[in-house]
Amino acid sequence: MNRLPSSASALACSAHALNLIEKRTLDHEEMKALNQEVREYFKEHVNPGFLEYRKSVTAGGDYGAVEWQAGGLNTLVDTQGQEFIDCLGGFGIFNVGHRNPVVVSAVENQLAKQPLHSQELLDPLRAMLAKTLAALTPGKLKYSFFCNSGTESVEAAIKLAKAYQSPRGKFTFIATSGAFHGKSLGALSATAKSTFRKPFMPLLPGFRHVPFGDINAMRTMLSECKKTGDDVAAVILEPIQGEGGVILPPQGYLPAVRKLCDEFGALLILDEVQTGMGRTGKMFACEHENVQPDILCLAKALGGGVMPIGATVATEEVFSVLFDNPFLHTTTFGGNPLACAAALATINVLLTQNLPAQAAQKGDMLLDGFRLLAQEYPDLVNEVRGKGMLMAIEFVDNEIGYDFASEMFRQRVLVAGTLNNAKTIRVEPPLTLTLEQCEQVLKAARKALAALRVSVEEA
């Protein structure tokens, strides 16, 4: 039977939500009611499948850790008042921490003036953010298109590469195995995980995949495409594969890819949605080897964990194909004043507090600690890898990885696997994590591994 719309029900639900938004604390009964409501509404109106993948489950099987508010810069507090050190970082959005006061203040100040732009008048913050990114990014990157997410920034990069290369008769794209570039149709064509691709086949034509880190395979593919007339428009890469399991390519791989792109007249698109904004110990991961892309994709941490924003930054030569008709690719909310205020404040914090350098220092500390633990627990841990504050602990199987995430949750540390894969647990905390909190994380990991060894031996 079709359900009739109910304005009264919608009004009551929205009023109840607004009342909750105003509250800073909940009493015990309110907490219980909210937990129950959230579970019910996820099941009935969001997607029941999410309940199966959430790691925040108590020993009794209750989803007791419904997010309520940020604690400090590096912690979250649930509806029961329990505080968790965040080593997940919203999959890389909280580089400057939770509710960073500089970012929040910038957004609040802009909100008091004008939240969204008119679409007709020139908006100052979009201009200032574009100028800032032109100064911050490497090489000849100069012009920016703004959007709302990483997927959108990749879509824009693909369209921009097509617009630039189509008159040159180049239509093929090369991506890599294990890549994740998003889940909209164009971005998904570059993504390499069958779980996400298969239900939506056929995807965009012209996408090829080669093994990540294999420069010979890249050269062979470029050469074969040229021989068959399928000339390559662009190569799209993550400098470090995030969702693929924090996979680092061999030293020299990115410069070699850049050289091949120049040789074959292909553009180089670097997807730094997850590795950018200081995450790996440099402002952008490509700077570790001084690689300069033709197009750079940014998002996630660009908004400071306060506002969603993505950016596609390109050289003047490439971006100029949009000069004659700037409406060829646009988005209503892209580059809105609130998002631009957040991004400008985020960049300011990253630079004034030298957070990329802090990420390098603290990342080395955590990686060294995790590697020592891996040596103590070779029966549980296969490998520890990473760069800066983007790390992964690879376990011997999915079950051990899932149990590790659950044990860390019980120790009040949030971690999670890569998408649909608990064998590799990602550690991606805010760059503002204190040295004391780094020590707490390592102590929690030691306790979690000790508990896992006992449970494995008893099984």
Curated annotation (Swiss-Prot):
Similarity annotation: Belongs to the class-III pyridoxal-phosphate-dependent aminotransferase family. Putrescine aminotransferase subfamily.
Encoding gene per record: patA
InterPro entries assigned to the protein according to its UniProt record, in alphabetical order: Aminotrans_3, Aminotrans_3_PPA_site, Class-III_PLP-dep_AT, Putrescine_aminotransferase, PyrdxlP-dep_Trfase, PyrdxlP-dep_Trfase_major, PyrdxlP-dep_Trfase_small
Binding site for pyridoxal 5'-phosphate: G150, T151, Q274, T332
One Pfam entry name: Aminotran_3
EC number of this enzyme: 2.6.1.82, 2.6.1.29
Alphabetic keyword roster: Aminotransferase, Pyridoxal phosphate, Transferase
Alphabetized GO MF terms: diamine transaminase activity; identical protein binding; putrescine--2-oxoglutarate transaminase activity; pyridoxal phosphate binding
An individual GO BP term: L-lysine catabolic process
Modified-residue entries (N6-(pyridoxal phosphate)lysine), positions: K300
Record's protein name: Putrescine aminotransferase
Pathway assignment: Amine and polyamine degradation; putrescine degradation; 4-aminobutanal from putrescine (transaminase route): step 1/1
Matches recorded under NCBIfam families: PRK11522.1 (NF008570), putres_am_tran (TIGR03372)
Signal peptide range in chain numbering: none
